[in-house]
Amino acid sequence: MSASIACVMIEDFAAAAQGIAGALPSVLVDYRQRRAKVAAASAAARAAGVAPGMSLMRARALCPKLTPHPLKLDRVEQMRERTLNALWTFTNRIEQAENRMPQTAVLWLDLGPTHDDDAARIGAQISTTLGRMGLPASVGLARGKFTALAAAGQAACGVQLIARGAEADFLAPLPVGLLPLEREDARKLDLLGVRTLGHFAALPRSAISAQFGRRGRLWRLLASGRDTRRVKPTRMPDFERAGFDFDDPVAELVTLDNVLSALAVTLSRRLESRASQPTKSR
């Protein structure tokens, strides 16, 4: 058994939630602040240097052909809930990363001890499920959260599995910026000429401790593929919901009974997947 954690990465999450697509440069703008700020940017806008967090004025200076759209947080939250509901059919142990939202959704799923073939199959099912929702997803599979995240970043809307023991070799050529660095930490590493995870992992532990303290020691472990951090599950809702829309009025009770039975089976499977029992239905 190898892979136990799946990382799901959905680029342009907010744009997908609001139905904004296309190759033109565009941004979603948060107008709630005194100065309008970019909340998410399309690939074309990012290529011009536009990034989440910068002011709309600066974004327009970098990309004069930019098209701004207002950020609709209610739509983003609805899509987040739909995404979680879809992923909860695979496991009830899911952690969300908030630091990249709403530009990118990143979620970790604890699959438990899983053979590589089974993990790859689950990863493909996750990708297909989200794709049907209009959410192109990249899925990384590994034994640790950091390696799974790095694998998702390399999967290009596909599935990439890192086998047990291959973590360090996979991570070595990747940029050191994948580590959770503060701006000043990144500047120090750049001055030292440390560009890759492999280079960072090869630094003496004493030197890393002297420069970065406890967090540096954690980064060294992550860069080496040794990540023992557990998935911190998001609390699941206290209810499940399923429905069916009839094209025409129901004339026979048999039809209604069949539909209700099918919905009951669907709800039962969802509850079983999250180790819950129904207490009330309506």
Where are these regions (language model features)?
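Flexible hinge/switch segments at interdomain interfaces of large molecular machines
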Residues: 99-101, 165, 233-237
